């Protein structure tokens, strides 16, 4: 069992425990589907990044920054971290957000060529 499937099962159990849905099977099925699609994306992107096949281009920077922001919001939702770790991730997420906006603007400008 991979780490992401464990994480998605944990998220589903939290959702059911907090009464977000009266049908637990539906929650588990939805979370499982989202987890599988995220795991496919994550493994292919990270494998190519670690193997050096994926150069640090604008789209890969956008992917990395998006993963950092998603990690921060998942920590905020779960709220099981210490205040120091949450403050560090908040700073990292804010920096990532502004870099993401800059990268998206640069990517759009490069592809369109003008305002």
UniProtKB/Swiss-Prot annotation:
Involved in the regulation of lipid homeostasis in the endoplasmic reticulum, thereby impacting nuclear pore complex biogenesis and localization, and nucleocytoplasmic mRNA transport. It is a multi-pass membrane protein. Keywords: Endoplasmic reticulum, Membrane, mRNA transport, Nucleus, Transmembrane, Transmembrane helix, Transport. GO terms for biological process: membrane lipid metabolic process; mitotic nuclear membrane disassembly; mRNA transport; nuclear envelope organization. It comes from Schizosaccharomyces pombe (strain 972 / ATCC 24843) (Fission yeast). Belongs to the APQ12 family. The chain crosses the membrane at residues 58-78, 91-111. This is Nuclear membrane organization protein apq12. One of its GO terms (cellular component) is endoplasmic reticulum membrane. It comes from the Eukaryota. It is found in: Nucleus membrane; Endoplasmic reticulum membrane. InterPro entries: APQ12 (IPR024316).
